[in-house]
Swiss-Prot record:
Entry GO MF terms: GTPase activator activity
Species annotation: Schizosaccharomyces pombe (strain 972 / ATCC 24843) (Fission yeast)
Cellular localization per UniProt: Cytoplasm; Nucleus
InterPro entries assigned: EF-hand-dom_pair, GRAM, PH-like_dom_sf, Rab-GAP-TBC_dom, Rab-GAP_TBC_sf, Rab_GAP_TBC_domain
Originating gene: gyp2
Keyword Transferase recorded: no
SMART domains: GRAM, TBC
Full protein name: GTPase-activating protein gyp2
Length: 720
């Protein structure tokens, strides 16, 4: 009995199970629509399972009530669907797949639910017929298909399949004294399981499958199992050679991350022979360049090289590309983003979990005034690849791809638990780090070293990988993907807020000392600027030189213009807004019409000028704003545009002053054009403009107008 499960403060953890949306649970494209679902019993090869079935756009999915049995079948891989004759109203079907396996489906919902489910299943099967022709040829490229189901396959055909760099440079080999060694019997067990329960497109995962995974996956099947369980096999099949078609053109283009990637190539698994040779280095370079160029919102981040270098040991470039993409979308979203927000979020979730599952260890870390993230950041960032010897690291990746992101939390918790005594005896942070270093050393040395340490009486260091797995997956089995997902959602806003504050402080640290704006105003304009360009486009170098185009500037300042109480803004209103924003944009660039973008530095400088001169020189600022030719005169169209802008920002406040301002603006226009015979040749100088402003009392309206512009640039109106 797992007592921890019952004293865990979050004792309603069972309520989280099933809260994960089906697309995330089955790791299928978020664009897949869940068309129908029903309660269902499935049977195959003397096995049965009861749970829920789902029809998606391209898949038939199932999970048992305890979530320990599941499958995700592409509808295109279904060969036949036949209804069994039944004396009652039970809906029972036999489904045949490409491996000639028969899956019995018995729908247990209401008659109406079952009829609807069957109707939609037949419809989607018909819709998938176009893809069915490509399934057979694609499956023949998979090692699992050749090993388990191809009658004509021989050793030469199997060896001809590309099994990653390991087929050329060797796979990591477990030492002979290591428990859980992947031997011939293990390979036979895998082949027997796959023949009985299906492989690749037709794999049914059961509790026995989980046990096999923990014992290790054979080298020739590892890439297939990773792809199938992660869901990356399906987008790779549907891509129809996307990687091969585009790799050459993409890597021949200049990549902004080339220098960073080049520096990290030789640091990626430096002890593995492939990355001491041009073949391995070139392979890794190609996929890193391709991924960063085809996922520009992510780009390149350190630790990508380590994870992809590991995947390439067993995978082709194409397999590794889709597998890593799936990893980043469904397992560790945001880990390798520009601000690694996903990594920081998971470290926060782990801190919460440690506090509530092993509170005595968490309290010890607090007493030592130690930042928990210093211990765990490399574990999560590199998926433990840097901490365990390579064959063990792949065993953890096996569990991760099959069971989901909870594995990272379970293994990390297990490391704390098996080292509990050493942590409690620690006197400072360095001694805690030493405890973990020694633990990794002993695990990586294998069983013989562990037995020697146990003989010396060191119980806390006595641990093998199978023992660590037992603690992780049995003692902490209540940590589920649904639980992790729920906690990610719970902490996401606070983590992002803290991250934004930290990023802002680091970006503006030097600017605070030099700007004429107050710290509050600088914070506001920074927030408005970042909202306009989007957080994914932040330049983490010199933020002052970060650029924004006119469309982004329009989003930034649009909040200065009050929304009208109509469904659609009148066309003249939209034109007036765009003209105003164009004037302000060019004025912010100091009239430089050749420059296509505006830097954050120039926005700050423009705001400084506006705020400094608004009270005493509002008429001068407004004149300069519309004197784009910089010849000291305003022409007819410029005076009219100024008047339209004043009406736009000053006469839609919804109070009694709207009418007063409109009257003053009308008087201003009359005074400007009184006595003018030909408006095409009309010009007004700065001095004449100031005189008319004084005569008509327009100064207060100009000042109000500029304040509204400033509020728009600072984002104050959006904030309110």
């Amino acid at each position: 009995m797992n007592l921890l499960k019952h004293i865990f403060l979050e004792d309603d953890y069972d309520a989280y199970e099933g809260t994960l949306d089906p697309a995330s649970f089955f790791r299928i494209n978020k664009q897949e629509e869940i068309i129908a679902s029903t309660v269902c019993e499935i049977g195959w090869e003397y096995s049965k399972s009861f749970g829920n079935a789902y029809i998606c756009t391209s898949f038939l999915c199932f999970h048992s009530d305890d979530f320990k049995t599941r499958f995700t079948f592409p509808l295109a891989a279904v060969r036949k669907l036949e209804r069994e004759n039944s004396d009652n109203d039970t809906f029972t079907f036999d489904l045949s797949n490409f491996h000639s396996q028969i899956i019995h489906l018995r729908f247990k919902g209401t008659r109406q639910q079952s009829e609807f489910f069957c109707d939609r299943l037949v419809r989607q099967l018909h819709a998938s017929l176009e893809d069915a022709s490509s399934v057979g040829l694609f499956l023949l490229s998979l090692a699992s298909e050749r090993v388990c189901f191809s009658e004509s396959a021989n050793s030469q055909e199997i060896e001809s399949i590309d099994l990653g760099l390991g087929s050329q440079f060797g796979y990591p080999i477990a030492s002979s004294n290591t428990n859980g060694l992947i031997n011939e019997n293990n390979s036979k067990s895998w082949i027997q399981y796959l023949k009985k329960n299906g492989a690749n497109f037709n794999l049914i995962q059961t509790p026995n499958f989980q046990k096999l995974v923990q014992s290790g996956i054979p080298n020739n099947l590892r890439a297939d199992i990773w792809e199938t369980c992660s869901g990356s096999l399906f987008p790779r099949w549907k891509s129809k050679g996307f990687y091969a078609k585009n790799i050459d053109s993409v890597i021949n283009n200049r990549c902004e991350y080339s220098e960073e990637i080049e520096k990290d190539l030789t640091r990626s698994l430096p002890d593995y022979p492939a990355y001491q040779s041009p073949t391995g280095i070139n392979t890794l370079r190609r996929i890193l360049l391709f991924y960063s160029e085809t996922n520009k919102e992510v780009g390149y981040c350190q630790a990508m090289n380590i994870v992809l270098a590991a995947l390439l040991v067993y995978c082709t470039e194409e397999q590794a590309y889709f597998l890593f993409s799936q990893l980043c979308e469904f397992y560790i979203p945001g880990y390798y983003a520009k601000i690694i927000h996903g990594l920081l979020l998971d470290l926060t979730v782990f801190e919460y979990v440690l506090e509530h599952t092993l509170p005595h260890l968490y309290q010890k870390i607090i007493e030592l005034d130690m930042d928990l993230k210093l211990i765990t950041i490399n574990w999560f960032f590199s998926l433990f690849i840097k901490d365990f010897r390579l064959d063990y690291a792949f065993r953890i990746l096996d569990c991760l791809f099959v069971n989901g992101p909870r594995v990272l939390f379970q293994v990390a918790l297990a490391l704390f638990k098996v080292n509990a005594q050493g942590i409690l005896n620690a006197t400072d942070d360095s001694s805690v780090m030493k405890v973990f270093r020694q633990c990794f050393d002993h695990i990586n040395q294998g069983t013989a070293a562990d037995e020697k340490m146990a003989a010396l009486g060191s119980r806390s260091s006595m641990c093998t990988l199978p023992q660590l797995f037992a603690v992780a997956f049995e003692y902490f089995d209540f940590i589920t993907d649904s639980f992790v997902s729920a906690k990610r959602k719970e902490f996401k806003s606070s983590v992002l807020y803290s991250l934004r504050c930290f990023t802002k402080r680091s970006h503006l640290r030097s600017v605070y000392q030099t700007t004429l704006l107050s710290n509050t105003d600088l914070d506001l304009v920074y927030d408005a600027f970042i909202n306009a360009i989007g957080e994914n486009n932040i330049c983490h170098g010199d933020v002052l030189e970060q650029k924004i185009d006119f469309n982004g500037f329009e989003r930034l300042v649009d909040c200065a213009a009050p929304p009208l109480s109509v469904i659609r803004e009148p066309l003249h209103y939209q034109r007036s807004k765009r003209k105003l924003f164009t004037r302000l944009y060019i004025w912010m660039k100091d009239g430089d019409s050749t420059e296509t973008s505006l830097t954050f530095k120039r926005i700050i400088h423009g705001l400084e000028r506006l705020k400094a001169d608004i009270a005493l020189h509002s008429e001068i600022l407004c004149f300069q704003l519309y004197d784009l030719k910089r010849d000291g005169t305003l022409r007819t169209e410029e005076v009219v545009e100024l008047s339209e802008s004043l009406i736009l920002l000053c006469c839609y406040e919804g109070d009694e002053k709207d009418e007063e301002r409109l009257t003053v603006i009308s008087e201003f226009l009359k005074s400007c054009f009184s006595g003018c015979q030909d408006r095409r040749s009309f010009q007004i100088t700065m001095e004449d403009f100031q005189a008319i402003v004084d005569t008509t009392g327009l100064h207060a309206t100009l000042e109000f107008f500029l304040k509204k512009l400033i509020d728009g640039l600072l984002g104050k109106l959006n904030a309110s």
